[in-house]
Swiss-Prot record:
Complex and partners: Alpha(8)-beta(8). The alpha component is a flavoprotein, the beta component is a hemoprotein.
Organism: Escherichia coli O1:K1 / APEC
Single GO molecular function: flavin adenine dinucleotide binding
NCBIfam families reported in the protein's UniProt record: cysJ, PRK06214.1, PRK10953.1
Identification of the protein by name: Sulfite reductase [NADPH] flavoprotein alpha-component
Catalytically driven reaction(s): hydrogen sulfide + 3 NADP(+) + 3 H2O = sulfite + 3 NADPH + 4 H(+)
Cofactors required: FAD; FMN
Alphabetical list of CDD domains matching this protein: SiR (cd06199)
Gene Ontology terms: biological process: cysteine biosynthetic process; hydrogen sulfide biosynthetic process; sulfate assimilation
Taxonomic placement: Bacteria, Pseudomonadati, Pseudomonadota, Gammaproteobacteria, Enterobacterales
């Protein structure tokens, strides 16, 4: 960065302001300067009047565009780190959310980087669905003048590992793009792979990308809004659990908990639509069982991230024990030469099925072997936090955050098993006990900025959580817009989550309509998608009145069934064929009128 000051006549600052700016930035590193540049761009982006008053810059040289397609925040963090690396190398770079990207301009991109995660059964993140559809449609342009690279994040415990990245990579090449680098598919522990890939990208682009002129604003893009907080995924807040209340009935097949966490005077802020990240500890009883099955001792030393820890502590705090993966099964089979597991090696479908139905501890029980402690540690994946849709608004609950947790419980040959994070919150954290948390902001699941806009909320099961936050916010704002909730669960008497609250909102006129689907209260199973079809005419009227549609919950089945029902309603009552209805719903997505938080 140059320290030479342009003539004062060309500056929008007076001498005193310029002196203060120079003093404030003297000791900053290039990466810090890049962040500050992006921060002030974000501040400016929130002030349309100031932005409009700024003279149009001279036509700038084409630079690098990074598209961030994130579901849980990891892809966004990688994209932001790459942006900072490129800015530090004095390269002209723009970072945009996939949901904000004007994808019809993709043909004009010269240097394009895509950082994407995968959700559901190989689908792109919600914010990238429209871009993905466009690239795979007949409207996609040739990209013969575009060089690109793709970094894909995923979880190898799922069958369609990194599928979204594979899709983008193959389609960009098919459209004529030139690969700068081979695609990288990163697993849950992605940091080392991302760091190496970022360095390779910077090296590859240095010879191809224009260096930003000193007078240019190199931070020409940012990811929506700048969130500043001392707490993050890597530096969580030590909060305390204040309420743990079961909100399903005694005879329900589901154990759903309403959890309230006290944030104290931390100043941690969130918005309706955000998620709460929870770092949990594994059950000590599960750790003990696994250690004993392998004939190990809990006090044996192991090395974790350069530190020496007792095996018990390492397993309880640092490694994933409740989710098995095909890679773990394959590696355990190879390591132990298990006669039961070796026949599965090489058969992806069988490995996936075994991993999905057999927890790690039961894999060891069924195929016992003797491993040393370090071999066990090397076999496992690092523990990662779980994300829960926030079920509260700070306009009502202030220094608290609420979540709705479906506790995972099941048996394996008569032995009780449970989900790591859900059982931690439900069973092992005492009242006022410590819970390490952070906020994962989700700018792709937000209430309309206009309080008069109607809202349609579709959230069966624990998918109801963010809509409780929405209603608290709409009530606090005295928003005049209509609100319509679709909720479903097996039984009315046992599974009507937050029933009293919804009844109060209806009585007070905050909740205009509520449609309920109970799948097991009658012979015929009824789901929320059936209620959507049943109310199709009225639903179409709301959509025509500008309503925003929100869907939260299961990505693999519910979200697909709901989307199909919406397409049928649009086609029938909008007088469209299937293709036109799909295009209409895609436009709603681009306009942020159709938003999903699915998992």
């Amino acid at each position: 960065m140059t320290t030479q000051v342009p003539p004062s006549a060309l500056l929008p600052l007076n001498p005193e302001q310029l002196a203060r700016l120079q003093a404030a930035t003297t000791d900053l590193t290039p990466t810090q300067l890049a962040w500050v540049s992006g921060y002030f761009w974000g501040v400016l982006n929130q002030q349309p009047a100031a932005l409009a008053a700024t003279p149009a810059p001279a036509a700038e040289m084409p630079g690098i565009t990074i598209i961030s397609a994130s579901q849980t925040g990891n892809a966004r963090r990688v994209a932001e780190a790459l942006r900072d690396d490129l800015l530090a190398a004095k390269l002209n770079v723009k970072l945009v959310n996939a949901g904000d990207y004007k994808f019809k301009q993709i043909a004009s991109e010269k240097l394009l980087i895509v950082v994407t995660s995968t959700q559901g059964e190989g689908e792109p993140p919600e914010e990238a669905v429209a871009l993905h559809k466009f690239l795979f449609s007949k409207k996609a342009p040739k990209l013969e003048n575009t060089a690109f690279a793709v970094f894909s994040l995923g979880d190898s415990s799922y069958e369609f590992f990194c599928q979204s990245g594979k899709d983008f990579d193959s389609k960009l090449a098919e459209l004529g793009g030139e690969r700068l680098l081979d695609r990288v598919d990163a697993d849950v522990e992605y940091q080392a792979a991302a760091s190496e890939w970022r360095a390779r990208v910077v090296d590859a682009l240095k010879s191809r990308a224009p260096v930003a002129a000193p007078s240019q604003s190199v931070a020409t893009g940012t990811v929506n809004e700048i969130h500043t907080s001392p707490y993050s995924k890597d530096a969580p807040l030590a909060a305390s659990l204040s309420v743990n209340q079961k909100i399903t009935g005694r005879n329900s097949e589901k154990d759903v908990r309403h959890i309230e966490i006290d944030l104290g005077d931390s100043g941690l802020r969130y918005q309706p639509g955000d998620a709460l990240g929870v770092w949990y500890q594994n059950d000590p009883a599960l750790v003990k069982e696994l250690v004993e099955l392998l004939w190990l001792k809990g006090d044996e030393p192991v090395t974790v991230e350069g530190k020496t820890l007792p095996l018990n502590e390492a397993l309880q705090w640092h490694f994933e024990l409740t989710v098995n993966t095909a890679n773990i099964v394959e590696n355990y089979a190879t390591l132990t030469r298990s006669e039961t597991l070796l026949p599965l090696v090489g058969d992806k479908a069988k490995l996936q099925h075994y991993a999905a139905t057999t927890p790690i501890v039961d894999m060891v029980r069924f195929s016992p072997a003797q491993l040393d402690a370090e071999a066990l540690i090397n076999l496992l994946r690092p523990l990662t936090p779980r994300l829960y849709s926030i079920a509260s608004s700070q306009a009502e609950v202030e220094n608290e955050v609420h979540v709705t947790v479906g506790v995972v419980r099941y048996d394996v040959e008569g032995r009780a098993r449970a989900g790591g994070a859900s059982s931690f919150l439900a069973d092992r954290v005492e009242e006022e006990g410590e819970v390490r948390v952070f906020i994962e902001h989700n700018d792709n699941f937000r209430l309309p900025t206009n309080p008069e806009t109607p809202v349609i909320m579709i959230g069966p099961g624990t998918g109801i959580a963010p809509f409780r936050a929405f209603m608290q916010q709409r009530a606090a704002d005295e928003a005049p817009g209509k609100n319509w909730l679709f909720f479903g669960n097996p039984h009315f008497t046992e599974d009507f989550l937050y029933q009293v609250e919804w009844q109060r909102y209806v009585k007070e006129g905050v909740l205009t309509r509520i449609d309920l689907a109970w799948s097991r209260d009658q012979k015929e199973k009824i789901y929320v998608q059936d209620k959507l079809r049943e109310q199709g005419a009225e639903l179409w009227r709301w959509i025509n009145d500008g309503a925003h549609i929100y869907v939260c919950g299961d990505a693999n089945r519910m979200a697909k069934d709901v989307e199909q029902a919406l397409l049928e309603v649009i086609a029938e009552f909008g007088g469209m064929d299937t293709e036109a209805a799909d295009e209409f719903l895609s436009e709603l997505r681009v306009e942020r009128r159709y938003q999903r938080d699915v998992y």
